[in-house]
Design a protein with these regions (language model features):
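Gly/Thr-rich phosphate-binding beta-strand-loop-beta motif of the actin/hexokinase/Hsp70
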Residues: 1, 6, 28-33, 147-174
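Early-domain small/polar-rich strand-loop-helix modules and first-structured segments
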Residues: 1-46
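Acidic-enriched, low-complexity/disordered segments with a strong bias for Aspartate over Glutamate
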Residues: 13-17, 26, 43, 61-64, ...
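Phosphate-binding glycine-rich loops and adjacent basic patches that engage nucleotide phosphates
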Residues: 25-40, 67-73, 102, 166, ...
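Nucleotide/phosphate-binding catalytic cleft detector across ATP-hydrolyzing
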Residues: 46-162
Length: 174
């Protein structure tokens, strides 16, 4: 399975018609953080779907692209080879407000739960353990990961100076 820039590059290299191009929604992060952005998708059959801005999506809307994205991530994560995971931590771009973070957590919870096997979903004792919560911002999460990876653990009176440049979907955070 290819992810991120490698997947996008392969996808765009292999597009041979505009139907495939316009049926692809590749700006989820930007759409989620824009209050008045309405997105129009055209599927391969030519059907047009107009999405409200992410914060204005309701259960009456056709679908939630973030929930669908979380579902596919869940299918990749939760399988026979990897096992089943019930605890998730999401990191967010620095400029995402509390409302967007809460909505993203809800979308991810619905999508990830849909990716779980029915036997897990129907077992109230197991599904009760399912949790998803907001962690650190993306740059802070990377810094924590890097410190752990390189075995850098400061003493209580010691400081480790570092810089993280996060070149994201339309922003650069430091």
């Amino acid at each position: 399975v290819l992810v991120s820039h490698e997947a996008a590059s392969k996808f765009y290299d292999e597009i041979d018609d505009e139907k495939s191009y316009y049926a692809t929604f590749n700006e989820l992060k930007q759409w989620a953080n824009t209050k008045n952005r309405h997105q129009i998708l055209i599927d391969k059959s030519g059907n047009r779907v107009k999405l409200n801005s992410y914060l204005n999506l309701t259960s009456k809307d056709t679908f939630d692209p973030i929930e669908l994205y979380a579902y596919y991530l869940g299918l990749y994560i939760n399988n026979y080879n990897n096992g089943i995971y019930l605890h998730y931590t999401l990191s967010f771009p620095v400029n995402y407000g509390v409302k967007i973070q809460e909505k993203l957590l809800n979308s991810f919870e619905r999508g990830l739960k849909k990716s779980l096997p029915p036997t897990i979903l129907s077992d109230s004792n197991i599904i009760e353990e399912f949790e998803i919560y907001a962690g650190a911002s993306e740059p802070a999460a990377y810094a924590i990961s890097a410190l752990e990876t390189y075995g850098l653990e400061p003493n209580s009176n010691e400081e480790i100076e570092y810089g993280v440049f996060d070149f994201g979907g339309g922003t650069t955070d430091f």
